Regions:
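Hydrophobic anchor at the beta1->P-loop junction of P-loop NTPases
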Residues: 5
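Conserved Walker
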Residues: 15
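Conserved substrate/cofactor phosphate-moiety recognition/catalytic segment
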Residues: 18-61
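Conserved glycine(s) of the Walker
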Residues: 12
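NTP-dependent small-molecule kinase module
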Residues: 143-168
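P-loop (Walker A) phosphate-binding loop of NTP-binding proteins
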Residues: 8
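Glycine-rich phosphate-binding loop used to anchor ATP phosphates in small-molecule kinases
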Residues: 53-106
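A glycine- and Lys/Arg-enriched "phosphate-lid" helix/loop adjacent to the NTP-binding pocket
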Residues: 98-144, 148
Length: 168
């Protein structure tokens, strides 16, 4: 079984992956860690700001890791924002039967009413080296992700209330 966890920044992808790892004992592949390893090692000239270019670049690698895990009968959790919404097109029906996908999406109302939680929990699993959280940008990104999930018929988990408090 391969579990894919996608979503915008600050939605809790890494936290969910951590909790699933603890529950099921599946290893976790963080696409962000892969990205930074490739960038810092000089394997790519892309930078962390090259989001539009990073998705196809990283997905080509992650896709083949997923296929290898399935072929080897290994379980794996993959988390990150670099999973394209048309990801299902890259797998045959046998592979798709062994993949679970969820996109974490915070509603506009949640982000407006709980922006303090978003900031407070941003380092609950990992230490971030990011600038200030832009709630308007997060709202825009989450709304775009919801529309894409609906367009592609993908499963999403809407975060609409104080669900994040469980991170404490």
């Amino acid at each position: 079984m391969v579990i894919l966890i996608s979503g915008a920044s600050h939605t809790g992808k890494t936290l969910l992956a951590q909790k699933l790892m603890e529950q099921y004992r599946y290893p976790v592949l963080s696409i962000d860690l892969l990205k930074m390893g490739l960038i810092r090692s000089g394997q790519t000239e892309l930078t962390p700001e090259d989001d539009n270019l990073l998705t196809p670049y990283l997905w080509g690698i992650v896709r083949e890791i997923i296929k290898t895990a399935i072929e080897n009968g290994q379980s794996l959790i993959v988390e990150g924002c670099y999973i394209p919404f048309d990801w299902e097109d890259d797998f045959d029906s046998d592979c798709l039967e062994q993949i679970e996908y969820v996109c974490l999406i915070m509603t506009k109302k949640y982000l407006e009413n709980h922006s303090d939680d978003v900031v407070r929990f941003e380092n609950v699993v990992e230490r971030r080296l990011l600038d200030e959280v832009n709630i308007d940008k997060l709202i825009e990104e989450n709304e775009r992700n919801l529309a894409s999930c609906q367009q592609y018929g993908l499963r999403c988990r809407l975060i609409a209330n104080r669900l994040r408090a469980e991170a404490q």
